[in-house]
Amino acid sequence: GAAEGVPSPFCDCPMCNYAREHGGKDVRKRSCFRLGRNIMIDMGPDIFTQALQYGSMCDIEHVLITHTHDDHFNFTALGLMSMATHLRTTPVHFYFSEEGYRFIELLRDSEIAFGGTLRGMEKKGIYAFHKLKYFETYSIGEYEVTPIRGNHGGNMAKERSANYVLKAKDGTKMLYGMDTGLYEEETLDFMKNQNLDIWM
């Protein structure tokens, strides 16, 4: 896929035309990966269509954001969640790298984000935003989650994508490694001792 999806709305190259004609697996939406009942990785701009295709997102409690490019974190989708808050008793938790979290700090009082009401939505318990440090392990939902430093930028200066090592209760360990180039030495050193069962 690509940041604009496949087929790109404004492209008539052979690949995009093939995807339009054949559909199915050749049509690619923007990033969003559901892990079990209540964890999701990224929340791109196709979340509405993905929910239509794959079912309700009501059980989502935790969203791990890889980076703040809008094909991975489309903050306007937060508005969809806020429209159903009467059905929720707990906030949806969003997790960012330290650099990516700065994007939330900018949005909190920005008129571009729901007329400057994001901070108020936090106070009402609709959302909770968290910073994660690379290479530290956190208990999130039913997984042990370790963000590792990817090699891909984001909207903020010096932001690098967070790829995620996730360990399930049964010991299965996976790497969600989207939007990265070749890993830097620090990440490679960390990964040497990871015995992965699944690499995405």
Residue ranges and their predicted role:
Residues I65, F96, K131, P147-R149, ...:
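Structural signal for conserved beta-strand scaffold positions within catalytic alpha/beta enzyme cores
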Residues N38, M43-Y95, N195-I198:
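Active-site metal-binding motif and surrounding structural segment of the metallo-beta-lactamase
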Residues E4-C11, M83-A128:
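Acidic/polar short surface loop at catalytic or gating sites that assists cofactor/ion binding
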Residues F10-C13, Y54-M57, A77-M81, R108-E111, ...:
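Short, glycine/charged-enriched secondary-structure capping and boundary segments
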